Amino acid sequence: LGLELSDLESLRTWGSLTPGHPEYGLTKFVETTTGPLGAGVANAVGMAMAARRERGLLDPDAAPGTSPFDHYIYAIAGDGCMQEGIASEASSLAGTQELGNLIMFYDDNRITIEGDTAIAFSENVEARYEAYGWHVQHVDFTNGGTTYEENVEALMEAIDNAKTVTDKPSFIRLTTVIGWPIPKLAGLAQVHGAKIGTEGVSALKEKLGFEDKPFAIDLEMVQQVRAAFAERGKGLREVWDEKFAAWHDANPDGAALLERMLAHKLPDDLDIPTFEPGKMSTRKASGAVLSALGPQLPELWGGSADLAGSNNTTMKGADSFLPEDRCSEKDPGGPYGRTIHFGVREHAMGGILNGITLAGLTRCYGGTFFVFSDYMRPSVRLAALMKIPSIFVWTHDSIGVGEDGPTHQPVEHLASYRAIPGLDIVRPADANETAVAWRTIVEHTDRPAGLVLSRQDLPTIDRSKYASAEGVARGAYVVCEASAEPKVILIGTGSELSVALEAREKLEADGIATRVVSMPCQEWFDEQDEEYRESVLPSSVTARVSVEAGIAMGWAKYVGCKGASVS
């Protein structure tokens, strides 16, 4: 499996393959980095949704259970997960979506770090999941608190029962004892994520009949277990390969699409729209770009946290991703639809997007107002940590949000999201920059991106007069050159680029040669070679001013100690 005894011996040490919280991309077969509790529940819901969408793209007409793309998503959650809001949000949506391919085990050991869960957690979790629309079962290893027996047969029977329920996700409450069978520690909070000590280890080994020496492993037994698993896996793989080969031969178009999606490649002739001079908000432009990309990229799908009309996240003609019984004349669609209705669940949306992305074949986006991105920040951070290409669409990006006032004005958000390592924050200045931004984002497969868009109409820059928007792909570019050797450089993003261009006209009229730079993405610009960066922001020009409708934090790097920021 890629892990050896030495890796277990280095558990929770710097640079090991066995950190305290397993990391995607570091350790083989780790399917997601959960870390914060509840994140994995949302990831699992996303994976189950992705499995349904992938089947719809590749094998929609196959009878249930016969497609090579039919599979189950299994998740394990604990008492802490059940208390986290993201798990509640995601579980609610999973019930609404009738995700019969999702089976979740709840390790009900009634212990968290501070002690017995009774001090903070008292609801009937089974009833809660029944209310969400899940199929619920209970397997009690404690036999009502009398004796402890890990009844694997009962657990397997529950799994088999879950598979017979195809119109509901399944929730299996598994009542256990934490730390069993460690003498004096089983059932206590002291064993939750803490070392049990030499005495505890010795007592456990005596209880289990092991030798009392460090890492006493019967290597012959290990080899036997590995061989047994390999043999079983080989047989299962042969059955699946036969089924897949039959599908592949019968579906050449689907096979070609699958090959492209597995390679994470875009069509060679991917086309994005261009926009004539005029006025258009970048959120509206984004909607137009999505509608243009839709027919070219069937793997691209997504939606909004109840703000689709404002976020412009619905592709033209895209049906809803919904069970048949929830579709209507207003919301036509089906289980293989393309438009996701996340509901008012920003945090779950972020985790679900990550789960869909981790599933590996499709690309997904989710939208909300930029100010509400605070509700999904942990999921965004995890996407950056995992280096996965989730796409976050955030509209209403500044004080220009309309009548809602300070609660909806995201003045600090640009700086705070730029502070997350590995996250691209892209704030295009007009419709054409938005188109190039979208194309560049879908070209990247190794990092997430936040696309930050305006509510209000912005001037669509006349590209016959100013530089091409293709410079967006490099993060920053000279949109308007000075009339002579520049004395001043104005740097603008988003809605403030047009302000910078107006300011240039006044400065030039006063005889001050002024260059205007559009910098929609600091992260992309920082990746450019030094020669290009120097060509855009020559070190000889120290009179620099950044203009952005947000706090100035982070701009000193670009304007320098002699520059200034209008914020």
Located regions from the model:
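Short, flexible loop/turn elements at secondary-structure junctions
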Residues: 15, 77-80, 143, 176, ...
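Short glycine-rich or small-residue beta-strand-to-loop segments that form or flank ligand, phosphate
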Residues: 31-33, 74-78, 137, 338-340, ...
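Non-catalytic, alpha-helical, charged scaffold/linker segments
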Residues: 205-239
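Thiamine diphosphate
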Residues: 1-73, 228-459, 469, 535-536, ...
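Short hydrophobic segments within beta-strands
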Residues: 76, 105, 303, 393, ...
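Short acidic, Gly/Ser-rich segments with clustered Asp/Glu that frequently serve as metal-coordination loops
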Residues: 80-86
